[in-house]
Amino acid sequence: MCIRDRRDTSARFMFPVFTAVDLEDMMIETMGRYRWEICRKIQGVHWNDIREKSLTSEYCDYMQFYRKNFELSADAKEKLKNALFRAKNNYREVFVKDYQNWIKYESRGSYRLNKVSRQILMTYCPFSKELRNELKANPMYQELLNRYDIQSSRSVKRILAVYDKYKRAGGELNQDLRDNLLYYQM
């Protein structure tokens, strides 16, 4: 196995020292590509299978069947069609552009995405707790944030039940398990 194929090591990003592009934009684009590719690598052959819920599978399903999606307006469908055309039907490139808008604009409460892509990104690429608390006052995000909070609390409850069962059986929580719990609690 090549070192670049190992999934259990930390990610490393390299950026040029001299560049004409804004470094923040470059980092956001790189993180979007990284999120897409790491999800593909973790999911394996099921990265595009909607039965296995993941960032890539839901986003591919959304882009493949946008014409039949009743949640999208005619204008949103036309924008997505143009985005797919500009990206030469490369779903990753469309995702990266949406991810850039998500981080740069939507995190500040400025609407750039349609309802479906916003919902997918909130599920798999949520904002920090501070940003989520700021956005709760915004009516466009209230439903999404409430749904996210419910899903998070269910995950925490499920993890705590497994951990309690593990402790009762004589197990001891190591640092990785505690970090995992902290991740779901944020």
Where are these regions (language model features)?
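Active-site-flanking segments in enzyme catalytic domains
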Residues: 4-186
